[in-house]
């Protein structure tokens, strides 16, 4: 399942590679399409329409929420709490339904295209003059779902985060200091749980995150509890981003003009998936 992606990509066209990369992470497949697509677009010097960027951003945050639901529910299960995983899966289904209504896939969206996104799977008939990019009722259903996500995160905090048994089994356990995290190149929620306020969304322009207001949750102790807590709080921030993106959705096309035969020019580019780069790494590149 996770073998030979680079070799497989050598014998496929650029549009076909999208179906490979979203299988790298089955829990948040949509997010894996973004780096490859953005890298190809940079090499081809393609400017993606703003509406397509917003749709990508919304689905990217939904994928993040879906992933965090799995982690938070399974994490509680690992320390002896059986019930939370069922609540997590129920709430996650609501988010997956939205992703499926747009992309046609729950785990493997294959939705991004070099230069934009494809028409929504649940949008009904399309024509060259009028392409339905989002299914009917998507805005309404998304707002309801995101409010439910915020409620679910609050429920997680009350039922699990405040549980004395859970705290005893996670607090001051598996401590990862900020210094050690930086030294080993740790990124994402694990790095932020160690107290480093660093997030790819604020450091690059691969999606228009700079247009929205949100916080970057961090931990204090870098222990097992903080790594759980940061993800719960991130679900709330992701829901806030989605709600803002829905309210500010621009009009316009879904796809930039691209050649019928996609051929990325020879060159080198880098779309960062690393959420933190230390000063030492900058001074001593390897």
What are these regions (language model features)?
Residues 276, 280-286:
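Single conserved hydrophobic/aromatic residue that forms the stacking wall/gate
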Residues 1-278:
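Active-site bordering "gate/hinge" segments
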């Amino acid at each position: 399942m996770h073998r030979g992606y680079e070799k497989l990509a050598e014998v496929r066209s650029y549009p076909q590679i999208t179906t490979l990369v979203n299988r790298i992470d089955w829990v948040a497949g949509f997010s894996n399409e973004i780096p490859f697509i953005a890298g190809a677009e940079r090499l081809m010097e393609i400017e993606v329409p703003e509406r397509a960027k917003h749709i990508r951003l919304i689905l990217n945050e939904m994928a993040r929420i879906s992933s965090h639901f799995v982690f938070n529910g399974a994490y509680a299960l690992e320390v002896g709490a059986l019930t939370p995983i069922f609540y997590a899966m129920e709430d996650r289904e609501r988010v997956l339904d939205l992703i499926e209504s747009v992309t046609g896939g729950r785990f493997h969206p294959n939705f991004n295209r070099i230069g934009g996104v494809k028409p929504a799977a649940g949008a009904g008939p399309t024509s060259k003059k009028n392409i339905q990019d989002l299914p009917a009722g998507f805005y309404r259903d998304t707002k309801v779902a995101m409010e439910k996500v915020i409620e679910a995160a609050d429920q997680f905090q009350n039922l699990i985060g405040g549980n004395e048994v859970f705290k005893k089994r996670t607090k001051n356990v598996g401590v990862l200091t900020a210094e050690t995290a930086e030294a080993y190149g740790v990124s994402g929620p694990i790095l932020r749980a160690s107290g480093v306020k660093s997030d790819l969304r604020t450091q690059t322009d691969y999606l228009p995150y700079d247009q929205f207001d949100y916080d970057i949750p961090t931990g204090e102790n870098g222990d097992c509890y903080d790594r759980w807590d940061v993800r719960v709080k991130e679900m709330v921030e992701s829901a806030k981003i989605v709600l803002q993106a829905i309210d500010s959705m621009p009009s316009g096309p879904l796809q930039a003009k691209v050649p019928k035969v996609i051929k990325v020019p020879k060159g080198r580019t880098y779309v960062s998936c690393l959420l933190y780069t230390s000063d030492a790494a900058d001074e001593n590149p390897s």
